[in-house]
């Protein structure tokens, strides 16, 4: 069948990953819960807010990298808390310095760019995001970018050189799920770079739907960290991602208006 989908490796910045679940490291009760939930998720990429997390810049304080070692995980520094391009670029440069010299040296230019518009909605400021992306790409960063679900902005971010676009499913931390599947579908159909859902996931079914739609991967934090049992939810998310990917590859049955019997009606016993 010509429309059968074949699986392709999940590749970022020249590296191939087995897990299509990326997880954040904030909002947990303590570092031990962070470690346990991350392990249960099966994630290989963990994202870290450089401005809020000690990666070695604060000597004498607990260092997240002692709990989530770069020897085991790909550390994805992000620019959470930045509200303009200048702040975001400065934060990425700091992250590169902090991660330089670690075993994950080969992935130290991989960053997650997010430039926020305001504290209330945490919507991305797409104008400042585009400005920052242009600078970071020129400086050799591999930029994964948090953006709105506007297909035109997603296209422009890919055109300036971002290696992945990460449209929000819903507002950060809301758990509302995929609020605008139509725009997301357009982005998926048009994008020439990997598309990852970022923000808004609330439970396992949200992650599955994103993967069924054709997303390369899903990034989440609050959905796991704010669950009543974060470690158990992390494991649920691991399975949800796999199930969604398999369903996408398998291809769902067509929707029909009228019933269609599972068993043939010919030759019935009379």
From Swiss-Prot:
Location relative to the cell: Cytoplasm
Gene name per UniProt: thiG
Positions of 1-deoxy-D-xylulose 5-phosphate binding: 173, 199-200, 221-222
Similarity comment text for this entry: Belongs to the ThiG family.
Keyword tRNA processing: no
Assembly, per entry: Homotetramer. Forms heterodimers with either ThiH or ThiS.
InterPro entries the UniProt entry points to: Aldolase_TIM, Thiazole_synthase_ThiG, ThiG
Single Gene Ontology BP annotation: thiamine diphosphate biosynthetic process
Lineage top rank: taxon: Bacteria
Catalytic activity: [ThiS sulfur-carrier protein]-C-terminal-Gly-aminoethanethioate + 2-iminoacetate + 1-deoxy-D-xylulose 5-phosphate = [ThiS sulfur-carrier protein]-C-terminal Gly-Gly + 2-[(2R,5Z)-2-carboxy-4-methylthiazol-5(2H)-ylidene]ethyl phosphate + 2 H2O + H(+)
Principal EC category: transferase
GO molecular function: thiazole synthase activity
Enzyme Commission no: 2.8.1.10
Protein name: Thiazole synthase
